[in-house]
Amino acid sequence: MNDQHLQDLIHHAYANSPAFRVRLDGAGISPDTIQTTADLNRIPVLTKDEAVALQAADPPFGGMLAAPLSAVSRIFFSPGPLYEPGPEEDDAAWEVAVKLLREAGFSAGEIILNSLSYHLVPAGYLFDGAFTRLGATVIPAGTGPADLQLKMAHDLGATGYVGTPSFLLSLLQKAEEQGITLSIRRAVTTAEPLPPAMRQVLAGQYGLEVINTYATAELGALAFNTGDGMAMRLLPEPLIQVVNPDSGQPVGPGETGEVVVTTGNRLYPLIRFGTGDLAMNIDPRPGESAQAERAVILVGRRGEAVKVRGMFLHPNQLRFAAAQVPGVQAMQAIITRPDGLRDHFALRVAAAEGADEAAIAEGLKAAVQGVCRVRVDEVGFGEVAQEEPPVVDKRKWD
């Protein structure tokens, strides 16, 4: 989103969206002062909980709609509850989605099995529209019976798939059991995590090219991953920031923050909308990278994280770090503040029998420092029960 587009969007939203106008006025911000992306950081982040509260107080859209209700063709639902107008035919989001599919290797003439839901939520509709605009033929299977989807995929010669990775794997396994040969060679997965082990099965055992997509009901597709590793490359649109959840200011490379998005949708402009997702910010050329050069590593939800020495720490980051060190069977982080001033960050580790504890301790210190950007003060060994929480915060704040 260039500066002129951003300026036009801010003025349009201020003039036509009562909720956005109240938000800016409440923060003492004039729309004329938002000239660049850097200026955008002055606007408070709108959390999903706040959006839900706005809609509850002023249904159906909480004053966030910037056009008459008659301009809305479709209304979708996401948990909260939160109502979202679907993208209109001229929405720029379609072009971005089509570019993603082309970059992933899809082309006109393909037949796509769409196993995402078409009911209430936008996922099925969004990918349906993107594939048809690409020139593909879509089988709108939705959440229909697996046996019927398998038959349709076989009979119609489906070459591509979009849906959850777990359902794709179950279809492939079912086809294998029944001696059915499928023509699916490429898949877009979304709506749930894609563990490395499952990707390996899909790619190695079944020979599929897998494009894992980060998308939300409110915002559509935001990032994607086409190979090994956890980094997901950002799409060029909408405008995506990774910010400190407390201050709302952008975090540096390698730091973890909340994914915050500004859409260019003039019908329903979501400006500085907080997804609640925490991610590590990957920026190869800080301050110079185009958005499409940047990436994120999703680590979890905001409510599950704790802050240690100014850095947000999520249990999934610790799990990832522990998985890099041989001999670690279980691990728990314990955060204390013994002197009332400085955080003490310790790890309690259950090691495999006969494992080199000294090597594990050094390996974990390096892995956690690299993944979480937090220095480990102490590593101890002992039992760690499976039911115990991965992070224990013993700090006293009174």
Regions found by a protein language model. Name each.
Residues 1-103, 107-108, 341-348, 355-398:
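Nucleotide 5′-phosphate-binding alpha/beta core
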Residues 3-14, 18-22, 134-398:
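Active-site glycine/GP-rich loop and adjacent strand/helix microenvironment
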Residues 35, 47, 112-113, 139, ...:
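Hydrophobic/aromatic beta-strand patches that form the interior of the parallel beta-sheet core
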Residues 78-92, 128-137, 158-162:
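Acidic/glycine-enriched edge-of-secondary-structure segments
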Residues 85-87, 106-111, 137-141, 211:
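Short secondary-structure capping/junction motifs at helix and strand boundaries
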Residues 94, 117-119, 166-167:
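Short glycine-enriched loops at secondary-structure junctions
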Residues 99-102, 129, 173-176:
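Short, well-ordered alpha-helices that flank and scaffold nucleotide-derived cofactor binding pockets
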Residues 102-136:
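Conserved AMP-binding loop of ANL adenylate-forming enzymes
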